[in-house]
């Protein structure tokens, strides 16, 4: 797996969708993945308004962040995942997150969902957005 970019941030829904779509085309991605726990169907509806042709996978978190992150952490430990470039905020979250971390690790969450979504798809390239 290759992490080619980190486009995470605090955006309005419209800006988030536009950024995700731009990344989808820029990196020739297979699909956009988003956690639906907070946005539900709204994310897909906003995406379809902007571009009905972009493939989308919604994921609903059923386990805690630590349990979701453990398999991805193992992939990095086995040297099966690589960052192409330096992603300061993402790397800081990856190195500092504990069960007691107060601030939600948005960038780490995106990375975990990205790699988890690709594990069974056969694709090894993903852009975080």
Task: Place the predicted regions along the sequence by residue.
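Conserved beta-strand -> loop -> alpha-helix junction used to position metal-binding or nucleic-acid-contacting
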Residues: 53-75
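RNase H-like, metal-dependent nuclease domains and their acidic two-metal-ion catalytic environment used
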Residues: 1-59, 81-129
């Amino acid at each position: 797996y290759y992490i080619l970019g980190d486009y995470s941030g605090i955006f309005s829904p419209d800006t988030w969708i536009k950024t995700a779509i731009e990344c989808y085309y820029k990196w020739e991605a297979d699909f956009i993945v988003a956690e639906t726990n907070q946005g539900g169907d709204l994310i897909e509806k906003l995406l379809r308004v902007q571009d009905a042709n972009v493939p989308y996978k919604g994921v609903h978190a059923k386990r805690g962040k630590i349990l979701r992150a453990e398999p991805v952490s193992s992939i990095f430990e086995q040297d099966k995942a690589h960052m192409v470039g330096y992603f300061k905020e993402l790397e800081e979250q990856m190195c500092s997150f504990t069960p007691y971390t107060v601030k939600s690790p948005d960038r780490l969450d995106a990375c975990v969902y990205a790699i988890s979504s690709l594990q069974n798809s056969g694709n090894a390239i993903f852009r975080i957005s």
